[in-house]
Amino acid sequence: MRLIPLKAAAQVGKWAAAHIVKRINEFQPTAERPFVLGLPTGGTPLATYKALIEMHKAGEVSFKHVVTFNMDEYVGLAADHPESYRSFMYNNFFNHIDIQEENINLLNGNTDDHEAECKRYEDKIKSYGKINLFMGGVGNDGHIAFNEPASSLSSRTRIKTLTEDTRIANSRFFDGDINQVPKYALTIGVGTLLDAQEIMILVTGHNKALALQAAVEGSVNHLWTVSALQLHPKAVIVCDEPSTQELKVKTVKYFTELEAKNIVGF
């Protein structure tokens, strides 16, 4: 596992965007051989999406031959609701780049058959072989996507009940009213995520410090689903200084020295 310790959240966004652009351009995607990118929502990746849009407008990257799969979607929230993850992705990213509509893959939280929808999503991912790079965030309790504590580390895309802590955290997007936050969501599984060729997780803020400690220094534990990254051969965590406050000083020092040449300029 790689850990990229940076000073501020803005640097995390820029580093992550530069890493994605590097991977896409190295891959040299075509219509017949697209680059497959997994994407999250939430506050943490906003800086990355902003930087990617700027790099696209500067001619540094094209998303014409990039296929995307999002991590999750609320159940029962209208697709055009301002807080649906579909709306989030179009407003904050898709509407500002040259991605082709048919290459955008999102879970449908309004289907009558959640099981069939989840199977369709898994099958669609498999039709591309695998996801080349999956970017994600992490919750205060260490959850990835909506794989709440005690989720199976071999889980696949499915419907999940959201914990009260998650709904309280997400209520900031619903005028602070937890009653407006859906109780269920469709989400990729931990196993789905681990199938990706590369995983990049963004961690910012002191409230994520315990989750980062669990991911880097803890044991693999289904109560901290982010710890499953330790099982992946090509995982990278990009973090800011506040999120490292629970890590041992020698851990931060080790990775700072190890990644020194990759941090210069950020």
From Swiss-Prot:
Task: Kindly give the PROSITE patterns that the UniProt entry links to this protein.
Answer: GLC_GALNAC_ISOMERASE
User: In which domain of life is the source organism classified?
Assistant: Bacteria
Q: Name one GO biological process term.
A: N-acetylglucosamine catabolic process
Catalyses which reaction?
A: alpha-D-glucosamine 6-phosphate + H2O = beta-D-fructose 6-phosphate + NH4(+)
- What's an example GO cellular component term for this entry? cytoplasm
Q: Where is this site: Part of the allosteric site?
A: 151, 158, 160-161, 254
A GO molecular function term, named singly, is: identical protein binding
What pathway does this protein act in?
A: Amino-sugar metabolism; N-acetylneuraminate degradation; D-fructose 6-phosphate from N-acetylneuraminate: step 5/5
What Pfam families does this protein map onto? Answer: Glucosamine_iso
- Enzyme Commission number: 3.5.99.6
Annotated family:
Belongs to the glucosamine/galactosamine-6-phosphate isomerase family. NagB subfamily.
Q: Which HAMAP family does this one have?
A: GlcN6P_deamin (MF_01241)
What's the name of the protein?
Glucosamine-6-phosphate deaminase
Which species does the entry assign this protein to?
Answer: Vibrio cholerae serotype O1 (strain ATCC 39315 / El Tor Inaba N16961)
